[in-house]
Structures are given as structure tokens and as C-alpha cells.
Curated annotation (Swiss-Prot):
PANTHER family: TRNA (GUANINE(37)-N1)-METHYLTRANSFERASE, TRNA METHYLTRANSFERASE. Residues 1-57 form a transit peptide. One of its GO terms (molecular function) is tRNA (guanine(37)-N1)-methyltransferase activity. One of its GO terms (biological process) is mitochondrial tRNA methylation. Keywords: Cytoplasm, Methyltransferase, Mitochondrion, Nucleus, S-adenosyl-L-methionine, Transferase, Transit peptide, tRNA processing. Pfam families: TRM5-TYW2_MTfase (PF02475), TYW2_N_2 (PF25133). It is found in: Mitochondrion matrix; Nucleus; Cytoplasm. This is tRNA (guanine(37)-N(1))-methyltransferase. It comes from Macaca fascicularis. S-adenosyl-L-methionine binds at H289, D327, L328, D355, G356, N387. Involved in mitochondrial tRNA methylation. Specifically methylates the N1 position of guanosine-37 in various tRNAs. Methylation is not dependent on the nature of the nucleoside 5' of the target nucleoside. This is the first step in the biosynthesis of wybutosine (yW), a modified base adjacent to the anticodon of tRNAs and required for accurate decoding. Belongs to the class I-like SAM-binding methyltransferase superfamily. TRM5/TYW2 family. It comes from the Eukaryota. GO terms for cellular component: mitochondrial matrix; nucleus.
Amino acid sequence: MVLWILWRPFGFSRRLLKLERHSITESKSLIPLAWTSLTQTLSESPGIFLLGQRKRFSTMPEIETHEGDSELFSPPSDVRGMTKLDRTAFKKTVNIPVLKVRKEIVSRLMRSLRRAALQRPGIKRVIEDPEDKESRLILLDPYKIFTHDSFEKAGLSVLEQLNVSPQISKYNLELTYENFKSEEILRAVLPEGQDVTSGFSRVGHIAHLNLRDHQLPFKQLIGQVMIDKNPGITSAVNKINNIDNMYRNFHMEVLSGEQNMMTKVRENKYTYEFDFSKVYWNPRLSTEHSRITELLKAGDVLFDVFAGVGPFAIPVAKKNCTVFANDLNPESHKWLLHNCKLNKVDQKVKIFNLDGKDFLQGPVKEELIQLLSLSKERKPSVHIVMNLPAKAIEFLSAFKWLLDGQPCSNEFLPIVHCYSFSKDANPAKDVRQRAGAVLGISLEACSSVHLVRNVAPNKEMLCITFQIPAAVLYKNQTKNPENHEDPPLKRQRTAEAFSDEKTQIASNT
């Protein structure tokens, strides 16, 4: 933070001292002894001071010490350790600069003073002057405005044009719970030095938090603050276990607000409805859903092995692709059917309720055999999405000799997008090696790895993309009469550095 301090030694020429620091501390060394003594004398002389004093509005001296951000607009210190929210305990009075102006010129003046005006939740920047009905007080930012010299040149010019005195006064502003931000409240309540949770994943009307152990004693308060400070949020929940069950959903507890977990979300132009307590949904994967969707073109085929409620299947179906979507969770299956109808793609998506391996070795195998019989010109590109990061790599074993006995076609090798977590120092290499080990073939030269997101410290979510080698799909590679020789595998561009470039997929189609 850059701070400008006005120094006027002995009442003569002013100088601005520029300090670059993160907090502001009182420093009397900048104030000459004579000035300090004078202000102390005045403060001890009520007879002198009462002439210019008002209850909440009084003249501001040119030299003023200022509290740092962490103090001036922080809740009262006695809320520290509060576990049950008491909104009345957050009342506080702060002293801020104001500018008195005629009420008829306020709107014209505010356009020029917008950057100098105070901006706090629930606080009007212009208020009535308690002592003059024909005037208004513009509340100013105490970290930008110290004296009239603190205004920008343009602002001073407008003040002069409108015949407004730049005299800065001070005003006792009463702050309440409504005027503090969620982070400020939680930072004041939780033990000093502890991490503060101010972020969450929004799922419709639900705020989904992942609280740490030291935050659990304050969980109900945290939940209520999230509801209070985020319009549209009516329920706050906390995950109480990892996603390690067969249905990919997690147990949660409602911290505050309503118990209703039926929600509706909008992602990438599509609407999804579901019971958040019974299915898996992660709003942080929105970009990844779009990335995969953009890789397919009209006429392509998508097999979504762990489809959830449809965030891959539905957008792809909208592109006039043929989609086969599967999920083992009966609730996900139910809402997948519902969302396909809701988004008017139910005629383009075939939906299954099977284990992932059974889906691959059943419907997927059958459809691939059907597609193999098509002529080269009619064969579509086939994509298989496997979004189950905790276990998806294990399911790659289902591709081993999946098409054995069928005529080998190197023009028809499905493209796999398989997701995984990694805690390795080189996560891309780790994912390649683990996937290759399951398939029994090296993927170093024919795969790309995309960083999806950072899940936790030293834990990444990645997507490895590759064409399934013919040596994996066919045990005995009987040549298709259309093919005279196997083309060499193309080396796909890697993403070791996890660049923002799109994943490049080598394809012979």
C-alpha cells in the first residue's frame, strides 16, 4: 500500500512524504515538538475547544494520526473468540473526513469526487448535515483524504468552479455489523494468526465451504456470516469427509440457514437441477467442461463414463454430437435424465446406470464395433471422458484388448480424456507413468497433460489426453482390408509447464 503523509513542519511549507508499506503506525517523530505541545494544550482546554466542537461533526486539524486498515474499519476487539453470532456486538464509531456542500450541487460534484468518496458496505456516501438542512456531507476515504491538498487537481478545480470550500471536517460515523465485510468479521472473530475462510463454492442458493480444523469451533458463525454477506445464499454447508464412496458424493452438514439441498445452477448457458447432498457437482470445473466441449465437432461421438448430472454430456449433445452418458449413482442417473429433458437434448443422449468398467466393456464396446463397420469417410471422431480423478486411471484397464477379434483400424482410435489427482513433484510425468502402467504401454510420446486446477497445497487435478494405441485395443492386430500399413503414432504436444494453450490432440481422422 502506498501512503502519502502530509508534513507541515512549524506551520510553513507543506511536504508530502511517500511511504510504501503494508500498515500505518503512529509516528510522532514527524510532528515537531512545538506542534505536539500545542495540540496537547488545546485538548486540555475545554473552554477553547468547545467553541468549534459539535456532537458528531467538527473541524479537522491539518495534522491527524490515522489508524491502519486493520484497525479503523475492523470490528471491535471484544468480538474475538465469539462462536455464536451477536450482531449487536459489532457496533463501533470511527472518525472520518467529510466535505460540506450545498445539496443542489451534490450530484455534479460526486462525479468528480467518486474516487475520493468513502466506499463501505451499507454506508451512503452522501448524508444530511445534522446542523444544516440545506447542506450535505460527502463522506471521504480516510486513507486518501487528509486535508484539502489531498484532492486530485481535477477535484480541486471542480470545487473551485462550484464555489465549494475545500475545508475538510471530521465526522463520527457509526458502524454496525452490516457495514463490515465477511473477511473483516471473521478475521476479528477467529484467533489471531489463523487462516480466515471468506471464500466458498456457490451451488445455486448453497454456499459450500471446506473448513479447517481450527475453524470448526466457529463453524455456525462462519456459515451465518456467509449467508448474511452474500445475496442469494440461504444455506451454508461444510464437507465432513472426502469423496471416497462409490457414488462420488460427500457427507455434509448444514452450518446455518435452510436445510433444502434441492438447487438449480446455470453453467455455460445450460441449466442443471439436482439434490446437492446426493450427487457430485463442482462449480470450479466450469472452464474444464467448456474446454472439452470445444474439442468436439458436430457428428462426433462422446462416451461420458462418469457423467454425473450432465456437465459434459449436455453441452456436447447441443453441438449435434451423439452422446452416451453413464453414472453408477442412481441419483445422478435420475438428475441426468431430468437435465437432458430440461435442456432439450434427451433425444441426443443415451443414458446408462452402470459401473464404469461395465459401461466400457458393454455399451461402449458394442457401439465401437458398430462404428468400425462404417466406411472410412463416415467414421466419426470418438472421445471418451473419464472424470473420476480419484480412480479413473484404474478404469483404463477396461480398454485392454477391448476390440480383440475385430479388424484393426488405425483410422479409428478413440481419444481418451482421463482425469487424475497427483501429489508428485512432477505431476504430469506421474500421471503419464501411472496411466501407461495400467495400459501396459508408454504414453510419453503420444499424450498431453493439462493442469485443470490446484486442489490443495501440493495436490493437482490433471487431465491426460491420448489416442488409445492399437496395441492396447487389439490383442491380435488383424489388418483391416482398407489398411496396408500402420501409420506411426504422432507425438502430441505436451503441457509440462501447464500453459494456457489448448490441448493439441493428434488424430488421423
